[in-house]
Amino acid sequence: FGLEPGGDSDSAGNKSFVQRVPVQTAPSGATWNVIGILRGTDPREAIMLSAHLDHLGVNDAAPGDDKIFNGADDDASGSVAVLELARALGPGKRPRRTIYFVCFGSEERRGLGSKHFIDNPPVPLTQIVADLQFEMLGRPDPKVAAGTLWLTGFERSNLGPELARQGAALVADPHPEQRFFQRSDNFPLALRGVIAHTISSFGLHADYHRVSDDVSKIDFPFMTRSLNSLVKPVRWLANSNFRPAWLSGQAPVRPSR
């Protein structure tokens, strides 16, 4: 796709696409993020397109013969969105802003991957003007118009309305009671000042965190149409002087314990 690696360097200084994330708690071991960079002409600003690449693995205690949690919608659909946007945006003229394409590990384990990324970013977080996280957009949500995606925290910043004006099939999250803005990898970034939201079409289907979240249930024509609506708006965001901002009183704050 013409991307530069943005992960760890080896002893010879060669960059990898993989950013390893140490895991200090059980189950021990390691997870990782994957980072690709489409270098822009202005090194002072960047945008980020992200998803999480993990799911729940295998559960031997699950009822029935199928013990594998495939996670087709949650969140293989988001990882595919990041890859397809990289495919669409990579060729041709370089954008003004650098675009970071990031897939986080271990979102399902307390967001370990995104938290490590925040503590070890490939670029200062102050230079990331926006992050769009993609999560569960493999099926249409019956609560919104056909072919439409929704944005968590739509009312919090000027980013969602502006992307919609630029042609994105994007509306406000129809499930505010679910608090999805706080439940995805966008939230740790938002707490650090990045204008970060999640794009989704999750209609609260019954396959959430079940072994039945299978690729056979993905609506590929819907994914294709809805993601295609984002290509020009994201390209515009990468080339414009528009800088997203939280609206008055809407910047997220860390929950009190």
Question: For the regions a protein language model found, what residue spans apply to each?
Answer:
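Catalytic-core environment of secreted peptidases
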Residues: 1, 32-102, 116, 122
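Sec-exported extracytoplasmic/periplasmic mature domains
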Residues: 1-8, 84-94, 119-123, 164-168, ...
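Stable alpha-helical elements in mature extracytoplasmic
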Residues: 1-2, 13, 17, 34, ...
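A non-catalytic alpha/beta surface segment that caps or lines the substrate-entry region
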Residues: 1-38
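Second-shell loop/turn segments in exported
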Residues: 19-25, 33-34, 63-75, 90, ...
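Metal-dependent peptidase/peptidase-like ectodomains
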Residues: 44, 94, 104-198, 202-207, ...
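His/Asp/Glu-rich mid-to-C-terminal helical/loop segments that flank catalytic regions of hydrolases
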Residues: 87, 91, 206-257
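Acidic/histidine-enriched alpha-helical segments
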Residues: 95-106, 131-137, 243-256
